[in-house]
Amino acid sequence: MSFADAMREEGRFTRTENGAVALNTSGDARLDLFGTIGSLREADENRITTLFAGAYAQDKLFATKIAFYARDIRGGLGERKTFRTIIRYMAEKHPEALRPNLDLVGVFGRYDDLYELIGTPLEDDMWAAMKKQFEEDLQNLNAGNAISLLAKWIKTADASSPATRKLGILTAQKLGYPIYNFKRIVRSMRKQIGVVESLMSAGRWDEIKYPEVPSRAMMIYRKAFMKHDAERFGEFINKAEKGEVKINASTLFPYDIVEKILYGRESNKVLEAQWKALPDYVEKGTNALVMADVSGSMRGRPMATSIGLAIYFAERNVGAYHNLFMTFSDRPETVILRGETLEQKICNVSRANWDGNTDLKAAFERVLEIAKKHNTPQEEMPKAIVVISDMEIDYCGNLEWSFYDKMANKFCKAGYVIPNIIFWNVNSRHDVFHADHNRKGVQLASGQSVTVFKQILQNLGYNPVEAMENTINSERYDCITVE
């Protein structure tokens, strides 16, 4: 190897905040983006655009699909801020890639994402796309047909915020309507699609159809519903708890619910009902164990995400690891879920050892310790281990091997094959990867959404790139094109 190549090889390595050897790239720029894009909520714009730029340089169509996967509220990660940062960057640097997909922004995300393009080279294209959808909705409204959700998110001049009012005036002008007429049309559209905020502001609480209230609106306004419509809303929630009526939760993240109980100490029937209503993406017979990072660096929302995803998976997994998972900080612990309600389960889990350092090595050693103590045969070991963490794991005592190499060696010496490992990043602060792009039996994931479980469990045994390509190249994203 030449010295230049040796320098490049050495340049791939980094250390976590706690001293463990890791890689600063997976070796595939697309995978670097995919493996972190759901965990960049606290990242600065430069880091987000740098990751996207690297992936775009490698494959512009694939990188664009990753961006829309990240925004995809129902089938992807539901990341709003990161997506908006990326589409603004695309409009400035690569308008040819975003232009043919403007009509899809409101399909995968929200129509108000389009406002991010004001002041960019694609502003005129954005207004044209919005006007086209608005005119189509107006025709359907007049014909008594279903319309899109554009009217829910479009800005009007009667908003309470001065900035939003200004944007509403601009919107009416750009779409070619007098301001008053525009407000009137939007009001009619919102009535057609049943925008709950319109009914609330008009004091028409008795007209709200609670089974039709969107997931996030139900969570945000739950106290207002109880205050202004206690009898009807209370009756609805009681029925929802029993499964007699539907309560929407499909676009919520587990942390949305968990953090209100974990940090807000809130006991609420709405939260319990929405938790039960979260979509189930865990297939029967799934042989996988979750390791949830509860170390000090995970405080706040990352902790609620880690615990929420672990509880979600454990209670819905009807296989061998039903109601079982592990936590790790300075000391790993086996958790057996107890309690009937989510509040009870969170209370019991919170008694575990939290807020220490991030000793993932000890957690894997604990798996081996339990297996050897009870003479567990290979076929009864977990097929997969899902590590939910910020990936800033502790120093493992070897200057050359990555964490995965060390653990694979330990399992081999103990007479076991290391399980498939999914490194699921929920709060990426640095470019840290614990496996490269061609490591078979390892997958990289990121984000806060339960849909990730479905994707990773369908890709066990693949290498990280294959698993990523199976997700991004699905039919759902075939509609995305670049010029």
Q: Locations of the language-model features?
A:
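Long lumenal/extracellular ectodomains of secretory and single-pass membrane proteins
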Residues: 1-305, 315-483
